[in-house]
């Protein structure tokens, strides 16, 4: 399977407490797009860096192993674009499954999506998030930007987004 990724990097911005390995998937299926989206370069599918899925998983395993030499636990953060877009969701499922099986409680799989929990259920996408530990759901809304009195962006980035932590899979 081929997967298109815009970028992969270590980040302290994409998770509220843990060092994250952020995977920005290419392509966003939201219409209209989020006003003032800071990832416009991820909108178009099938651009940027093309990976064989197994090669991408190995790259991520190597990065996780390296990070776990210094940290007890890290986040693997799935962003975009849109990780649950039809052309990304199978890869997101396979990556999250393999990483969770290998690293178990040493990683926290965290997925960002413009979709709400209701939309995930309505679109029958629950299976794709089976190995996620946390979700940040809802479109970015710049008019509801979540900042402190000094202007620092808080988590999540807009007040309409929901941060959900759970220990077991969502049931249908």
Predicted regions and their residues:
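Short coil-to-beta-strand
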Residues: 32-33, 63, 71
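Conserved strand-to-helix beginnings and helix N-cap segments that scaffold or border functional pockets
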Residues: 88-93, 121-125
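Well-ordered, non-membrane alpha-helical segments in soluble/globular domains
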Residues: 55-56, 60, 90-95
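Class I S-adenosyl-L-methionine
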Residues: 1-24, 151-172
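Canonical Radical SAM [4Fe-4S] cluster-binding loop centered on the CxxxCxxC motif
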Residues: 3, 13-53
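Surface-exposed amphipathic alpha-helices with a cationic face
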Residues: 92-105
